[in-house]
Amino acid sequence: MIQLGNGILVEMNGCSFRFDPKRVLPDEISMISHAHSDHLPSSFKQMSAICSPVTRDMIKARRNKEIAICSDDRVTELEAGHIAGSKMFLVDGETSVLYTGDFCTREKEQTKAAKPRKCDILITEATYGKPQYVFPDHDEIMSIARDWLQDIVGKDGCAVLYAYPLGKSQEVSVSERSSSSPSSRDC
């Protein structure tokens, strides 16, 4: 059985697996795919969950909440490629279920790409799943941004970039720092 609400609940083989729960419930195996706020429980003092050490540490830094990392022999953590520490979870039983929160199939400086896995059921987030969402080539956009930054700073200007605080800002920062001619400085 798969149930939406309070994250995603998958019940199989007499166990309850809860992916990205909003509320922590007893007697369930909780999994947190990554540390973006829309994938975290809204309130808890402490909890046990299957997640990466990076995700645990980010939650501690962002929310000052403690998570004890646990494991389960039926659950395999796989790279999701979304942000540092992001994971997909493959639950094996009579049926195999693969859950992904956000994922990325492109290698990035701070993450490994998500790789396809065989499964019976795939549960995925589809924030931009509609055909109307077509994005330009990532490397091309990053190149344009680096050129723009170098041009601004080369004219003794000051550029301020806005990006999501967890994920995009690190990606932009790493990309800009790795360009051939440094363009970042304190403004």
Show where each model-derived region lies.
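Long, charge-dense
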Residues: 183-187
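Surface-exposed amphipathic alpha-helices with a cationic face
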Residues: 19, 176-177
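Active-site ligand-binding patch in enzyme domains
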Residues: 180
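A short acidic (Asp/Glu
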Residues: 170-175
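His/Asp/Glu-rich metal-coordinating catalytic cores
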Residues: 2-25, 29-163, 167
